[in-house]
Amino acid sequence: MSQRQVLQVFEQYQKARTQFVQMVAELATRPQNIETLQNAGVMSLLRTLLLDVVPTIQQTAALALGRLANYNDDLAEAVVKCDILPQLVYSLAEQNRFYKKAAAFVLRAVGKHSPQLAQAIVDCGALDTLVICLEDFDPGVKEAAAWALRYIARHNAELSQAVVDAGAVPLLVLCIQEPEIALKRIAASALSDIAKHSPELAQTVVDAGAVAHLAQMILNPDAKLKHQILSALSQVSKHSVDLAEMVVEAEIFPVVLTCLKDKDEYVKKNASTLIREIAKHTPELSQLVVNAGGVAAVIDCIGSCKGNTRLPGIMMLGYVAAHSENLAMAVIISKGVPQLSVCLSEEPEDHIKAAAAWALGQIGRHTPEHARAVAVTNTLPVLLSLYMSTESSEDLQVKSKKAIKNILQKCTYLPALEPFLYDAPPNILKHVVGQFSKVLPHDSKARRLFVTSGGLKKVQEIKAEPGSLLQEYINSINSCYPEEIVRYYSPGYSDTLLQRVDSYQPLNN
């Protein structure tokens, strides 16, 4: 056998390995093939090919493993059990950029499924190597490493802290300054997932100088990048007044308000979320948002979208209104109440209705003027029907009841109160009658109208426990009228009159 024939055997073996690993990588892209591949023992075969002498075979084997691990947590668990991770981590530091990208993809695919699998990656020493990859010359390697670090950090504070301790944050801040959009996106996303867990982790992101760089990119034309930037700034802002103030000091207003008009729904939602996370902390921060035109802009945004995109804006209006009478009035003046009423009536999802009910309650609870602004939009009957409906979720019922109570206890606008005399259950009726007992003694026109509209008659029909607060309210209302008027409208009075007619003896001339 000649030398050429001998070498041909090796060439054929190499071709067969190449063909096999390429086919497996291709088959792994289709979900219907996954179980068959797993049952055929593909993991152990790919593990061997990771150590192949041919670099392209190594890279394709890593790619195939990543695709399999990405599919479900059982396959990711198999990667861990087959002891593949240490091999990947070792090669990640030694190999070329193509292999690094493929190996980082496997780590990301394993780590995304659960904290336990992410911890397995940390335990095999991958973090230090991934952080080194963030300094790689190739942007694709940086991007792959940032993906893997993000998927580890997002699970919980402990894993995030491990990523921070490995020195990832300053390098991720450098990555958001790189020209490649894809790298900027994933670096911003990783910073967001680190910051979300605790004030301390968010402070680490701030200390690395991330906020100023993120704020400068709010107007970047790439929607996905804006989505991630706004998310990262929200995750920093949400934890404390100090962190929210640091974000505000990066001069995000008024530029962030332009994002509320963006074509992309996620950009709108995340911009609303950022404004909410700032406004919720203090009256001063809410006032800053109002002064920047944030309340009016959020109300316009709520009007231009539907569903969950509306939710953070609805909550933001509630937070602003909750702080003070003046801030609640700012929401009213900006026509926030009609928009919230529309959400309450139109939105099919109970959790969005519940948020709108809560926000309306926060607006109406301050003074009679605030309560009237809510009542004139015909919101109270809608809240009552949501509270009474058996189809409403428990949370929606609770929030509707609380909103009704908040508004009723300040409401002196009687046309809005009167329908409640007929429709409200006893626990709500008490508050309605209470409001009439406050207004009627001081308003002669209202007293007359209360008689002609049938309100006084209805009050006489209410069965109240003797000595109860409700009975006190009824007595207070009755004391506003002559005794014979109260008797005239009391149940059974017509029968009494008829008895008197029957028993009356005409005087004979």
Swiss-Prot record:
Keywords: Cell projection, Cilium, Cilium biogenesis/degradation, Cytoplasm, Cytoskeleton, Flagellum, Microtubule, Repeat. Changing V106L: In a breast cancer sample; somatic mutation. It is found in: Cytoplasm, Cytoskeleton; Cell projection, Cilium, Flagellum; Cytoplasm, Cytoskeleton, Cilium axoneme. The keyword Transcription does not apply. The keyword Metal-binding does not apply. GO terms for molecular function: microtubule binding. It comes from the Eukaryota. ARM repeats lie at residues 31-70, 73-112, 115-154, 157-196, 199-238, 241-280, 325-365, 368-409. GO terms for biological process: epithelial cilium movement involved in extracellular fluid movement; filopodium assembly; neuron projection extension; sperm axoneme assembly. Gene3D superfamilies: Leucine-rich Repeat Variant. GO terms for cellular component: acrosomal vesicle; axoneme; extracellular region; microtubule; microtubule cytoskeleton; nucleus; sperm principal piece. Highly expressed in testis. Important for structural integrity of the central apparatus in the sperm tail and for flagellar motility. Interacts with SPAG16 and SPAG17. This is Sperm-associated antigen 6. It comes from Homo sapiens (Human).
